[in-house]
Amino acid sequence: MRTLLIRYILWRNDNDQTYYNDNFKKLMLLDELVDDGDVCTLIKNMRMTLSDGPLLDRLNQPVNNIEDAKRMIAISAKVARDIGERSEIRWEESFTILFRMIETYFDDLMIDLYGEK
């Protein structure tokens, strides 16, 4: 799950086709959980610098269920789409924060999205 999400979020940042995977189609369905108009507000609330990736912990939004976990993935993907170049961003911190927030739901996410762990 970690590798899939890393590749997906990096792909959303720059659409590098070498990162594309057919599993991304299901992850892209999560986009409907976050309005495009909200992305600018979310970025502002994250107080990011030019080299930051999505810093979800700064949103103060708890992850209490699988739907919250899906929303965090969607937020990460949409913020990644709208921020700077991949090579300029410190992704490691962003992924550490995301995974810490949603790791409890990894198995449930895989079953919900793909029908298996």
From Swiss-Prot:
GO terms for molecular function: identical protein binding. It comes from the Viruses. Coiled coil: none annotated. It comes from Vaccinia virus (strain Western Reserve). Keywords: Early protein, Host-virus interaction, Inhibition of host NF-kappa-B by virus, Modulation of host cell apoptosis by virus, Viral immunoevasion. Bcl-2-like protein which contributes to virulence by preventing host NF-kappa-B activation in response to pro-inflammatory stimuli such as TNF-alpha or IL1B. Gene3D superfamilies: dsDNA poxvirus. Transmembrane segments: none annotated. GO terms for biological process: symbiont-mediated perturbation of host apoptosis; symbiont-mediated perturbation of host defense response; symbiont-mediated suppression of host NF-kappaB cascade. Belongs to the poxviridae OPG035 family. This is Protein OPG035. Induction: Expressed in the early phase of the viral replicative cycle.
